């Protein structure tokens, strides 16, 4: 950035601050609630692997977030997970500027605008364990900037697009790049039907990875059904294309008991082919290494019931059974085998 540009930015900043000061002097102070809001999610569960006869208790999520408004147009959010599979992770850290109701600009770390299921927070999930799309194939948080715009053409159309480092929050100190990752998402919110299309480009190594996702959600009364498909392509044929699918249905049944407010039976089918995270492994002085299979091809059928002790997604007990089907030669990770899951989720 040259001196002329820097000087212009400083002058614009001074003018903005002067205008704001004059506004307050004229008695036009904004009626803004600046009290920070503290929210959190705790997910604790017991899992029993039916084939191995082994079980475990786990605190899967212990998230705490602080969000609020600085002015009518400026807001912020910071969220941390104190126990993401035993690790402390910074999740969100961003400032959002919304000059009017249809336009917003966000800068910082956030979940990039891509897919349906990966964008659900833990308290908004329908099942105890996420789909393959949300967990392995399309799950990305990164540092960058994003623009969102909403149209109303008889129904809302929401478009979000952004550019991102590719470094994540923890690796950004000495991270410099000549290129950027990008992600874009369009939501068509028809009555009772949501159509979502999204695309993303990442570059974990010298191999660029392009992803394309499409999904439809149907909701009517207490019934919801959703299907989502993701296609992943690696440049230079570094790895074969990846396909992933997720489909589920859920029906809410209100009940009148002192403890349980709603019972929701649900079923899911998801699938993914052999998958690489895009990073090279087994590098030597003479070889860059190669992309490997990080997740083997598998199908999964999940069935269960959710007991809501309050409003939906506030205090839920999720009881699931997961049945896995691996391809011949596929290696199952320790936590991805046939199992019964009982999870308690609390949102505050």
Locations of regions flagged by a protein language model:
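N-terminal periplasmic/intermembrane-space "pro-region" immediately following the signal or transit peptide
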Residues: 1-9, 18-43, 348
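Outer membrane beta-barrel
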Residues: 26-168, 178-180, 186-194, 248-250, ...
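Outer-membrane beta-barrel pore domains
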Residues: 50-52, 71, 96-98, 118-120, ...
């Amino acid at each position: 950035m040259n001196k002329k540009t820097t000087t212009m930015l400083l002058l614009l900043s001074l003018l903005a601050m002067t205008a704001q000061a004059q506004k307050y002097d004229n008695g036009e102070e904004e009626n803004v609630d600046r009290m920070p809001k503290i929210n959190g999610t705790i997910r604790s569960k017991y899992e029993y692997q039916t084939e191995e006869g082994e079980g475990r208790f786990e605190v899967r999520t212990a998230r705490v977030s602080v969000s609020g408004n600085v002015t009518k147009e400026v807001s912020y959010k910071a969220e941390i997970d104190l126990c993401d599979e035993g690790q402390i992770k910074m999740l969100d850290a961003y400032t959002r500027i919304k000059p009017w109701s249809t336009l917003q600009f966000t800068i910082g770390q956030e979940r990039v605008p891509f897919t349906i299921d990966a964008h659900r927070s833990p308290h908004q999930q329908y099942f105890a364990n996420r789909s393959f799309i949300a967990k392995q194939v399309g799950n990305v948080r990164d540092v960058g900037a994003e623009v969102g715009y909403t149209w109303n053409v008889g129904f809302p159309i929401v478009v979000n697009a952004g550019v991102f480092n590719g470094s994540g929050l923890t690796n950004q100190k000495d991270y410099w790049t000549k290129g950027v990752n990008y992600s874009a998402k369009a939501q068509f919110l028809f009555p009772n039907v949501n159509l979502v299309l999204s695309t993303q480009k990442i570059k974990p190594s010298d191999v660029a990875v392009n992803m394309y996702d499409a999904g439809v959600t149907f909701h009517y009364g207490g019934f919801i059904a959703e299907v989502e498909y993701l296609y992943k392509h690696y440049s230079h044929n570094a790895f074969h294309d990846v396909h992933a699918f997720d489909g589920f249905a859920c029906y809410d049944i209100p009940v009148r008991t002192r403890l349980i407010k709603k019972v929701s039976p649900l079923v899911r089918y998801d699938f993914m082919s052999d998958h690489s995270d895009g990073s090279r492994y087994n590098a030597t002085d003479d070889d860059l290494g190669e992309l490997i299979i990080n997740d083997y091809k598998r199908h999964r059928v999940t069935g269960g019931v959710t007991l809501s002790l309050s409003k939906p997604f506030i205090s839920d007990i999720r009881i699931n059974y997961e049945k896995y089907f691996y391809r011949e030669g596929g290696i199952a990770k320790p936590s991805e085998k046939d199992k019964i899951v009982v999870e308690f989720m609390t949102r505050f």
